[in-house]
Amino acid sequence: MARLQDTLSSDQATRDAAEQYLAHETLPKSGTDDVLGVQLAQILSEASLSLFVRQAAAIALKKYVRKRWSIFFDTFTQDMVVNGIVQTVDATPVEAKEHIRTSLLACLCDAEPKVRSQASDILSLISSCDFPDHFPQLLPTLQGYLHSYTEQDAHAAYKVHGAMKFLLDLVHVELDENQLLMVAQQLVPLLQGIVSSSSDWITPHTRARCINVFHQCLISLYMAKDTYVDTVHMVTTHYLPPWLQGMQVLMSPDFFNSANWQEPVTWEMLGLRHEIVAFLGTASHFRNIFQEYAPTLLRLVIAQLQAMVPLFIECHMLDNISFPSSVEADADVACSVSM
């Protein structure tokens, strides 16, 4: 703990010494002496600690994972020199890995957005080599988080945001065929349920983030279409049509008739439409499926662009309407007037 706090010191020498110590501690000691990773994960998940200390723990933990977790990573440090002799050590012990993964999953529903974001980043790195064989609890836990919006759960907003932030990070990783199929089959329907839900709890930003996740899945599928032909065909044929139908409802041009640009939620609604247009651009590459919905969706997109012209003039030419700033947690689905 003291070393992590020292990394935040205003004194350069103190910071350098602390960072050097932590860098040394992430190097292999022995196959059994492996408590650093668990300790860092515990510090990250401890809500009573200073946010800066928790963030410092996250930075150190990510370095630890890269060097110690698995030979799967190119950065894995397998050999060390002790008294001039090169010794080979094992990766992080199984029990320690379980503790760390459990702590990181808990951090996904932390009240602090920055903790959720850093935990997601580390967990996606771990999942790229552990999921699904060594990380079977991942998808059930995420499903529980995504289902929480239907329950009277005080932490539902954190859970849903954390789960979707992780999914975004995960689908940016190069998933194999089995991983991609499992994510699509078990989580994409839940995301669609959130998007189409009539619940007042579901904010436009939450819906936009769901679309963003599936959008990234589509990008991964498109890039893998020549490698995983059957999987890509099955997933897109089964899951894409319901999403395209839902986009028609969400793109209703009536929104602009009553839009109040003094209300933050109005800008969130605009951000949702921006995310839909980006999604449709990728979905259009799957022509056999998209062509059925293309005429209606194209009319809706053109109608939206026409409706946005007055807003564009007010924001960018006359400067009569102030463009809102987004909080860090919502930067990934922030609105735009330029489309």
Range-by-range predicted roles:
Residues 1-48, 151:
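N-terminal "cap/leader" segments of large eukaryotic alpha-helical scaffolds
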Residues 2, 17-20, 35, 39, ...:
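Acidic, Ser/Thr-rich intrinsically disordered and amphipathic helical segments
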Residues 10-11, 48-50, 111-112, 150-156, ...:
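Short inter-helical turns and helix N-cap capping residues of alpha-solenoid HEAT/ARM repeat scaffolds
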Residues 14-15, 54, 97, 116, ...:
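Residue-level detector of extended alpha-helical repeat arrays and alpha-solenoid scaffolds
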Residues 22-27, 57-68, 122-130, 163-174, ...:
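Hydrophobic residues within the alpha-helices of tandem HEAT/HEAT-like
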Residues 27-43, 80-110, 132-153, 180-200, ...:
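Amphipathic alpha-helical segments within extended alpha-helical solenoids and repeat-rich scaffolds
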Residues 48-110, 114-117, 121:
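Eukaryotic helix-linker segments that join adjacent hydrophobic helices
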Residues 331-339:
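Extended repeat-based solenoid scaffolds, especially LRR ectodomains
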